[in-house]
């Protein structure tokens, strides 16, 4: 017996049968061992018996019984599974005869299945006879599966019914109602139909950005085929979606992948144009299965594509088409391009309306129309790195899932009460152990409290469960309507007019009426009482998801946020002292943006802050970040002195291709891409190379910039603040009593215009002049710095108070109009914080003590009280 004459699957089956015999301590490998392996591991054997309508469970039980009857041999020196039984040897001989009769090159699994039918006394054959299955019936099933193919390779079993194994029948999925409806895209579907109707090169390739609905167009074509809404040439055709992944997966030996693909193509060819092959991500066939000297899938397709023997629909993205298919001109010319543009917001809304019912049935929720409109418009405005309708569909899906999870999980109010009950029960158990009168009194009070909480918990639980049941009932009725509509479609397609009439005029209206009654009852209950569960998906839920994805607040303003925004200017005044105009302009820009009336095509605001050092330019940006986001982490600070050389400018948007750091992206663009709602602070802009401002022109005007990777970065939700010391000499010399005269402002602007190009300055919203700080401002800043010191010492539980004399002395001593507030910090560190630190370290100031700082003979005194 030559093992090379057997297919790989038969060889593997015998090896596994031997392992089974060894594990079972059987001396010989028997037919039962082989069939145990075939029925558990061979998909082909199961498929044969399935087509022959054999009860596989009964057959498996027979095999199990036969195995238990084989004697177990134990003892030393016994070799298990080293010999074949007489019956198995005969089975192999008979299998070889079957192979010759069927004119095959190798002995494969089907020959074993046929050969066992010749062993009349074998329990397997007896069981099949009992099921009234003859050898002829089994042979017919095998020939049906083989589809006229011969066993010409050692991988033969892999290649039977290749389309079923490596593809999905989209038309069958439409018939069984598994695919979502396809709305719109009529022009593209008509274009595909036109190309498919050609004599040669009838192979459309759908090209478009990820998420625009390329696969949906093919699904739409499948739905039209089912509805017979296609030209005569396409009626009754089948669309098979080929899964390249499963075609490649498990191809261990050279040539195995090509063999599988050849089997697929052969089946398509044999269908005489009845099968349209859809290859999603068609660029994967270029180079697929290629090893040294081997032919790749793309080259195998070319001859059939050119001759029109293969109707193929491809789908790929623009980038991948350019990268893979355009390089192979011979493959490209065999396809006809169909460009799939991104749908408009209006088209997306109609797509969402078409899918609304499917989402409602799946999630068991109620979707408002304003939620669909919000999903399309908000995703278009805020999620800029993805494409419609995919991103809008994802938004609706996630919003529905959020509501569904809330329905299924315990409401927070009930959860709180349940936890309180548990806590009181633990306390009750502890108090029962105590025997003193006080504990007994406390136990009585606690038991009354516990009874109240338990009653409340039970009421809430029953209310929650009844609401949940109502929602589930509505969901079930919706599913029933969907199922009946699918049945109606099937009946109409099969011209079963009696069934169609019964469904259309009888069953469907009755169930729809039931649904309307349930929904009306539900609405009535909602109006009368407070509901625990929410089943409505509104625009607020969509806005919350957008905020969660992007970090941009797009939900409607809640009361607390309104107050926060209206008080933004006051909050900033407390942190940035003496710069009222600057604070007002910046807070107004944020107010306009949050109210939703800013220009949607530009950043929230762009400002140039001009003024001497230490007057609060950077401090205002920090204060704004803290007030808007409760942390300074949302401030993207870029020191423009790092961009003084021409070659360093590219670091903002990323190194060009071929340079080190190309993959990392730009310092500015990457920061904004990850955090689209932030404050961008460009510090000391006059120190940057002039080319930097050419990059910023697009950002300031259109709120967008393209990075080195070709990605569009959205700056529409950023506040751009640029600081500069230009004109600070004039501001210091000519500011009178803390006011800037119009002449001074004009002179500073002239200096600014000589430094920067007019097209740059013209795009900035406001140029704000910061006044040099007066002595009164400095006193206010002293108060602020002392408060900060008090907060730092509060951690050590030390309180400090500074007398007014000491504060006034600090302000006068540290005041320097040229350097602003920075010397003030240094002065407090040197003359207040350092002596204070020395006292703390020496142990003179202990925790829980208070320190009074006063002035005596121009020296600070520290009086400690416990």
From Swiss-Prot:
Lipid metabolism among keywords: no
Sequence positions that bind ATP 2: 611-618
Ligand binding (ATP 1): 208-215
Region (NBD2): 561-772
GO biological process, one term: protein refolding
Recorded domain comment: The Clp repeat (R) domain probably functions as a substrate-discriminating domain, recruiting aggregated proteins to the ClpB hexamer and/or stabilizing bound proteins. The NBD2 domain is responsible for oligomerization, whereas the NBD1 domain stabilizes the hexamer probably in an ATP-dependent manner. The movement of the coiled-coil domain is essential for ClpB ability to rescue proteins from an aggregated state, probably by pulling apart large aggregated proteins, which are bound between the coiled-coils motifs of adjacent ClpB subunits in the functional hexamer.
Subunit and partners: Homohexamer. The oligomerization is ATP-dependent.
The name this protein goes by in its record: Chaperone protein ClpB
Organism, scientific name: Listeria monocytogenes serotype 4b (strain F2365)
The encoding gene: clpB
